[in-house]
Curated annotation (Swiss-Prot):
The gene is SLX4. Residues 75-173, 189-231, 352-376, 539-608, 621-648, 705-784, 819-846 are annotated as: Disordered. Pfam families: Slx4. Regulatory subunit of the SLX1-SLX4 structure-specific endonuclease that resolves DNA secondary structures generated during DNA repair and recombination. Has endonuclease activity towards branched DNA substrates, introducing single-strand cuts in duplex DNA close to junctions with ss-DNA. One of its GO terms (cellular component) is Slx1-Slx4 complex. One of its GO terms (biological process) is DNA replication. The keyword DNA damage applies. This is Structure-specific endonuclease subunit SLX4. It is found in: Nucleus. Keywords: DNA damage, DNA recombination, DNA repair, Nucleus, Phosphoprotein. Residues 150-159, 352-362, 579-601 have a biased composition (Polar residues). Forms a heterodimer with SLX1. It comes from the Eukaryota. Belongs to the SLX4 family.
Length: 955
């Protein structure tokens, strides 16, 4: 790397003189050095910061600039000129960029020497900072090759000093070719021919090129070179910095001037416009401002089609004038054509004054100040529905919202559907001035408050809930809808006719009287069929298991005498009225579904006399039972009527049913057997076995007529219908008639009647052999079992639970009644039997067998007439007691109304303290009787002592 010959701090002018001196020192024919120096020094040369500094272009800015600005200016100049670059020549070798272009100097003193001076034309040939060549002012472009040929005009023969010139680093031909290529590459588009290029290359060989010694230095050394004035500020004096104005030819078309695409025609209106003229609305303004000075020439040179674009724009989109109906409110002025000025900005269309602007502004009504609203509290909102202010007294009562849907709306619908009917605004009536609220008297205020609907609740709830008349309207609407008749177009539901059942026949009121007593018309009623046996056969075919017991076959059907003359209605009901409660609870288990007993359930209280076909044969009684007895309510709520039993002959022992062995049965089977007799389920197995043994003995061990049976004496007296007047009842006749009965205690294996058949054999899985059972089967009810049952009962009941004894006469013994039985079948002895009572005592007329809380069984004797009288007195005493004034201590009647549990001992003590004497009953009452009374009235009652023998604390 060679060191530079001159230091960067040396002035460039001195360096030039030294250079020339050294170059011509070896040539004797050269002019003097002073002449050369003086000529060379007179040339104004710009300051250079380095050997490779380019000349400053004339269009360079005099201020500081950035790379972005230089790039923008280069792009702008390239866009203005249409450039066609020639194909570049192939270079043999990539050479480094020449720092200083060679300068051609003619040193001949005799011939005119064209010394190149820094003129603007030469500077154009050089490459500017932006890499773009400059144009000449003459209005055309010249090639760099022509400039080179014009400058080098001195022949080589007239310049002998060039032969003695020191050789340059590069040859002359290479230098000229390289310099020409560099100039051609950096100049603007050149349109020179090949002849010019060859001419330039030929003349370049005769040139004496002068070039400085090439200095190879790094980029860091260039930055350290000092310069007196920055090249950005060095501007030649003869170069004008004023911008050249843009000259637009007059005959250029508009598309070439602006390079714009034709604009899409804009639609003025999407609806049919009014028939107006735009002459006056948009007049041509002579004072319209021009956007730029260049647009005036363009507008004058624009074709007529472009100028009249707005005249025909509306015709393309608007409807024809013939189709548009002229509106009465259209302005009468005719509008002129639109302005003929085409500008970039949108033309502001002037709109003429409308007719509305000519109408004088009406005086706006003066708004009256709204009266101050009093702040309303929640209580005020809640009580606003009850205030009478602002309401018209003579106005019709407002109908409920719900009742309006039930009214016929035919007239209203016809009125609204009429085509001529129009909605009319309701006439506003002036509100009457509210009168001052009249102060009512105390009595009137009380009456008004009594008629007022009170709604209870908090004030916030009352403010949000429905109006107080909502519930009242709801109930009124429900009542009105219920009163409506059925739909006449709906098909009626044909229900099967049902006769009167025991539920309706035995219905009683609050006082115990029969309700809806049916009166039979004996005159117009249809006659009975000629063949009475047909009814019995039909019943036997429907339910053969009920009419004919198992094991009894080849029996002849008896004759049923249905004599209408023996029907009596009034007397049986009169007798029932005498013993209301007794008859109500007499045969609650008579309608059981057991097959070994058949209950009499006639739909009407008629007398049905059973006439046996043969007196010597043992026939079971045929019962006219209701076919639909399965669909009836429980037997405890029904009143049955029982027929008098016919005389029964003795049945041979061969037809006896063996006694079942309850010991081998399971608990489930024992529970079913207990429920079949009408008892509730018993927890202990031994108690169930003992109870079943007693029931079996009471059913199968007793013999005799029905008149001698003490258990059904009351039933036969109250429920057996009488015959015609003057005749005694069949039950009484059967009781008085002498009957044959064996003397002494009857045998266990004997059967009192042929109809005494049980379903035990059908339910037990164990098969029993036919014939007489063994003797050990009759003593299954051991005394230990009876003691267990007696120990679990109250003292009054335990004395009555004993082994049945021999009784000489038991005509006054009451029947056994099972209350609140859950089983389907109850203990329903047939009137044809005369069994002994299950729990009876010969010393007492009526025995209470009601078991309390200590046992799970509920046994009670049918209330007799004496008990019915006692119950009536208890009811009267409880209801007639004065009301209590202490809320903490209500009366007994108030407790019952509030469904409070009644302590039986306390109520019995209260009744015995003089309340029964007050109502006319001379005697005392036991807690067990009070319990029976509570159960008959469905009153919640309990014992003071619990199951474990402890006293209840919270009562």
């Amino acid at each position: 790397m060679t060191t530079p010959r001159f230091l960067p701090s040396s002035p460039p002018g001195q360096a030039r003189s030294d250079l020339y001196t050294t170059l011509v020192s070896s040539s004797p024919d050269l002019p003097s050095i002073n002449e050369l120096v003086s000529r060379y020094a007179k040339k104004p040369k710009p300051l250079r910061s380095g050997s490779n500094a380019a000349s400053i272009p004339t269009t360079a800015t005099t201020t500081f600039t950035t790379a972005a600005k230089l790039l923008q200016s280069a792009q702008a100049e390239q866009a203005d000129l249409v450039e066609t670059l020639p194909p570049p020549r192939a270079k043999t070798k990539a050479k480094p960029k020449q720092k200083d272009p060679p300068e051609v100097v003619d040193l001949s003193p005799d011939l005119p020497v064209n010394i190149p001076e820094p003129q603007p034309e030469r500077r154009k040939a050089r490459k500017t900072a932006n890499g773009v060549t400059k144009k000449k002012r003459g209005g055309g472009e010249e090639s760099v090759a022509d400039d080179a040929t014009n400058e080098i005009t001195t022949p080589t023969k007239n310049q002998p000093w060039k032969f003695f010139k020191s050789p340059s680093p590069r040859t002359t031909s290479d230098l000229e070719i390289t310099g020409f290529q560099e100039v051609a590459a950096t100049t603007a588009p050149v349109t020179t021919s090949t002849t010019d290029l060859t001419k330039g290359t030929a003349s370049a060989q005769n040139k004496v090129t002068k070039s400085r010694v090439r200095k190879t230095s790094s980029a860091a050394s260039r930055k350290k070179k000092a310069e007196t004035v920055s090249r950005h500020f060095a501007v030649p004096d003869d170069v004008s910095t004023a911008p050249e104005p843009i000259t637009v030819p007059d005959d250029a078309p508009e598309e070439q001037l602006f390079n714009l695409e034709p604009a899409v025609a804009r639609r003025l209106d999407w609806t049919p416009p009014r028939e107006t003229n735009t002459a006056d609305l948009c007049p041509v303004s002579s004072n319209a401002k021009e956007v730029t000075s260049t647009l005036d020439g363009a507008l004058s040179a624009a074709p007529a089609a472009v100028q009249n674009v707005f005249l025909t724009l509306q015709d393309k989109f608007a409807y024809p004038v013939e189709q548009v109906a002229r509106r009465p409110d259209s302005p009468s002025k005719e509008l002129g054509p639109p302005p003929e000025v085409i500008k970039k900005r949108k033309v502001i269309q002037l709109v003429g004054p409308s007719n509305d602007s000519k109408i004088p502004n009406q005086a706006s009504p003066v708004k009256s100040k709204a009266p101050k609203k009093k702040p309303r509290t929640i209580t005020d909102l809640a009580t606003a529905a009850y205030t009478t202010e602002g309401k018209q007294s003579n106005a019709p009562a407002k109908k409920g919202t719900l009742t309006s849907y039930l009214e016929g709306q035919g007239e209203q619908v016809f009125q609204h559907c009429h085509p001529d009917s129009r909605l009319r605004k309701p006439e506003r009536k002036r509100k009457p001035k509210g009168r001052g609220q009249v102060l009512l008297s105390p009595l009137s205020a009380i009456d008004q408050s009594a008629r007022q609907d009170f709604v209870f609740g908090t004030s916030s709830q009352l403010a949000q809930e429905h109006s107080p008349t909502f519930l009242r309207d709801l109930h009124a609407a429900l009542r009105q809808s219920n009163d409506f008749s059925d739909d006449p177009f709906a098909s009626p539901i044909m229900a099967a006719p049902q006769g009167r059942k025991l539920w309706t026949a035995g219905a009683r009121g609050e006082e115990g009287d029969l309700m809806n007593i049916e009166v039979i018309d004996l005159v117009d009623s249809p006659a009975f069929p000629d063949d009475p046996d047909a009814i019995v056969r039909a019943e036997m075919q429907k339910s053969p298991s009920r009419s004919e017991p198992k094991g009894i076959k080849n029996r002849r059907t008896p004759m049923v005498n249905l004599d209408s003359s023996e029907i009596d209605i009034s007397e049986p009901h009169a007798r029932d009225l005498e013993s209301a409660n007794s008859a109500e609870h007499t045969l609650k288990t008579q309608a059981s579904k057991s097959t070994h007993f058949a209950s009499t359930t006639p739909p009407r209280p008629t007398k049905i006399t059973m006439v046996p076909a043969c007196e010597n044969t043992a026939e079971p009684p045929i019962v006219a039972s209701d076919v639909d007895s399965d669909n009836e309510p429980p037997p405890s709520n029904q009143q049955a009527y029982q027929m008098p039993p016919p005389p029964r002959p003795v049945v041979p022992e061969e037809t006896a049913i063996p006694r079942p062995n309850f010991e081998v049965m399971t608990d489930t089977q024992l529970s079913k057997q207990v429920s079949s007799y009408g008892f509730k389920s018993v927890k202990k197995r031994s108690a169930m076995i003992a109870l079943l043994n007693q029931c079996w003995e009471s059913k199968a061990g007793a013999t005799g007529a029905a008149g001698q049976s003490s258990a059904f004496a009351t039933t036969s007296r109250t429920s057996a219908p009488r015959g015609p007047r003057g005749k005694t009842s069949t039950a009484a006749a059967a009781a008085k008639s002498p009957t044959k009965r064996p003397v002494g205690r009857p045998r266990k294996n004997s059967v009192g009647a042929s109809g005494d058949v049980t379903v035990v054999e059908a339910t037990t899985p164990v098969k029993r052999p036919r014939g007489r059972p063994k003797k050990n089967a009759k003593a299954e009810a051991s005394p230990d079992m009876m003691q267990n049952i007696a120990a679990s009962m109250p003292p009054t009941v335990a004395a009555a639970v004993k082994t049945p004894r021999r009784r000489k006469k038991a005509a006054t013994q009451p029947a056994v009644e099972i209350l609140d039985s859950d089983g389907e079948a109850g203990l329903s002895p047939s009137p044809s039997l005369s069994p002994e009572p299950v729990f009876s005592s010969p010393e007492k007329d009526s025995v209470d067998v009601s078991i309390g809380e200590h046992t799970t069984m509920s046994l009670a004797v049918t209330p007799t007439a004496q008990q019915a009288e006692l119950f009536t007195r208890i009811t009267r005493a409880v209801k007639s007691a004065p009301r209590s004034t202490d809320p903490d201590k209500p009366s007994w009647h108030e407790k019952m109304l509030m469904y409070d549990p009644i302590v039986l001992e306390d109520l019995a003590a209260w009744l015995n303290s003089g309340q029964l004497d007050r109502v006319g009953y001379d005697g005392e009452v036991a807690p067990a009787d009070v319990k029976m009374w509570c159960e008959s009235k469905s009153i919640c009652c309990l014992w003071r002592m619990s199951y474990r023998g402890r006293e209840r604390k919270r009562l």
